[in-house]
Structure formats: structure tokens, C-alpha cells
């Protein structure tokens, strides 16, 4: 349950059952004070936060996610503060095409602090609304075209900041063999791991597979349900729904799909 737009519930931990004959009720997890010390998995921290200094709050989230795979976080949006939003802006590609509002990265940055302050207020007061995605296409070769969703700069800023928060949780869940769309990892890292595996073990075959139109066919409701296993902050879930349902603008025509996510 949410207490209101201005406040999230405290994070909740689903604790393991006690010894036989006793059952533990779900416990309430409260973030310790910023000065609390603890051992850190430095390698994973570097992967998770390599492009942003680790804030004490997100580090505590990461540690809680690492300690309990069934921890459900109900207080996350407050981590998206002005500082993180400004960092997210500088993490974006400078030369990316403008979205439906025609605003470029450079134009948004002319009054960056003022824009981010206003965005922060709308975000935490429930006034933020995602703009439709502008549809573009890129050549895949052989005459095939890949649809590309071009998001407005301000939406990109919020999304990039939210990714940083969610990565503190999900980087503790992902398998070491996973390389796609993860911070500090690339296709070259995957190839290096493959080369090591081939050289170390006897390999008879390699499977190269691809899911056709993967992003275009994702079931949005199932995606939300999967996220809700870990994320219990209703405001974060509402943000995800707004982005999924923001719609697409192509050749002046607006449409909303109940499946798929913009690329």
C-alpha cells in the first residue's frame, strides 16, 4: 500500500523461515544511517556503479539485494534526486536525435539545473507525464529495416536515473554468464568468456540463436509482474507503465500497443 504521492512505504524483507516448528513473519527493513559500514563486493560494485559514484543510499539497496534474494523494495523513488538526474543527463548520448518535442540534448542543457529541478518536482509530486516515442528506422542490411523508438530527452533522463536505481538490485540477481545490456559489460566481454570456455573445456558445438522481434513482442503485463517480484514501490511501477503506454508517433499518427517496448 502507498501512503501517498509524496512518500513510499519502508522497504520490506521476506525473511527465511526459522527452524522447524517456527515461522517468521515478513520483517520490515529500514535503511541504516549513512555512516553504517559493511563489507562490499568491490567487483560487482564497479560493474553496477562504474559510471556514477556510489551513493550511500543505493549502496545500502545493493547490499540488501545481495543479502536477500526475496527482498522486495517498497521505497526507491526517493533515490532519484536532483544530483542523480543531472548525472543521468550527462550519461546520455550528446548527438542522439530529438524526440517528439524536438528538444535536443544541447538545448535541454542550456538551463540544465532549472530543467532538472522542475523535473524533480513533477516526478515526486505525481505531475510527470511521459511523451510518445517518435518512430524511426535503421537499415539492418539486405533491405530490412529495424524500428527504432526515439525518446524525448527529459524522458531519457528519468529512465537513465531509474536504471541506475534498479541496477543496484538486479545486478545482484543476474547470472555471471549474462552480458546483454549490463553496465560494464559488452559483446567483447562475452566473446572473451567464450574463448576462455572453448580453450578450457572440450566443446563440440556452439549455438547461435536470436529471438525474432523480441522487443516488439514483449508482453507488457508479464514484464510488470516480473518486476513486481522485487519492486514494491508503486510510484516506480506507475512510471514503468507510463513509459510502456506512452505510445508511438509515426508520420503524424499516434498509436498505443499493448505489447512490446521501444528500442
Residues covered by each model-derived region:
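Non-catalytic, polymerase-adjacent accessory regions of viral genome-replication enzymes
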Residues: 1-102, 106-113
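Phosphate/adenylate-binding "loop-and-lid" substructures adjacent to NTP/NAD/dNTP-binding pockets
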Residues: 83-93, 102-145
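Conserved phosphate-binding loops in nucleotide/dinucleotide-binding enzymes
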Residues: 147-152
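Short loop/hinge segments at the start of secondary-structure elements
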Residues: 155
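Catalytic-loop motifs flanking and including active-site residues across diverse enzymes
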Residues: 158
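Nucleotide/phosphate-binding loop and acidic/charged catalytic motifs
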Residues: 162
Amino acid at each position: 500500500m502507498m501512503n501517498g504521492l509524496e512518500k513510499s512505504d519502508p522497504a520490506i524483507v521476506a525473511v527465511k523461515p526459522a527452524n522447524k516448528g517456527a515461522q517468521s513473519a515478513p520483517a520490515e527493513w529500514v535503511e541504516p544511517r549513512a555512516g553504517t559500514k559493511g563489507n562490499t563486493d568491490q567487483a560487482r560494485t564497479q560493474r553496477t556503479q562504474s559510471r556514477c559514484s556510489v551513493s550511500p543510499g543505493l549502496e545500502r539497496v545493493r547490499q540488501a539485494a545481495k543479502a536477500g534474494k526475496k527482498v522486495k523494495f517498497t521505497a526507491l523513488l526517493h533515490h532519484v534526486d536532483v544530483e542523480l538526474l543531472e548525472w543521468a543527463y550527462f550519461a546520455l548520448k550528446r548527438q542522439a536525435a530529438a524526440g517528439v518535442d524536438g528538444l535536443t540534448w544541447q538545448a535541454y542543457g542550456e538551463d540544465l539545473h532549472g530543467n532538472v529541478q522542475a523535473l524533480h518536482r513533477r516526478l515526486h509530486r505525481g505531475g510527470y507525464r511521459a511523451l510518445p516515442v517518435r518512430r524511426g528506422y535503421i537499415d539492418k542490411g539486405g533491405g530490412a529495416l529495424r524500428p527504432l523508438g526515439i525518446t524525448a530527452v527529459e524522458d531519457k533522463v528519468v529512465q537513465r536515473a531509474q536504471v541506475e536505481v534498479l541496477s543496484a538490485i538486479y545486478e545482484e540477481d543476474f547470472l555471471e554468464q549474462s552480458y546483454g545490456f549490463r553496465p560494464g559489460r559488452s559483446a567483447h566481454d562475452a566473446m572473451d568468456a567464450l574463448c576462455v570456455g572453448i580453450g578450457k573445456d572440450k566443446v563440440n558445438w556452439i549455438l547461435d540463436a536470436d529471438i525474432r522481434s523480441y522487443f516488439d513482442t514483449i508482453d507488457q503485463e508479464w514484464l510488470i509482474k516480473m518486476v513486481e517480484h522485487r519492486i514494491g514501490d508503486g510510484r516506480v511501477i506507475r512510471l514503468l507503465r507510463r513509459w510502456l503506454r506512452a505510445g508511438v508517433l509515426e508520420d503524424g499518427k499516434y498509436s498505443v500497443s499493448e505489447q512490446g517496448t521501444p528500442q
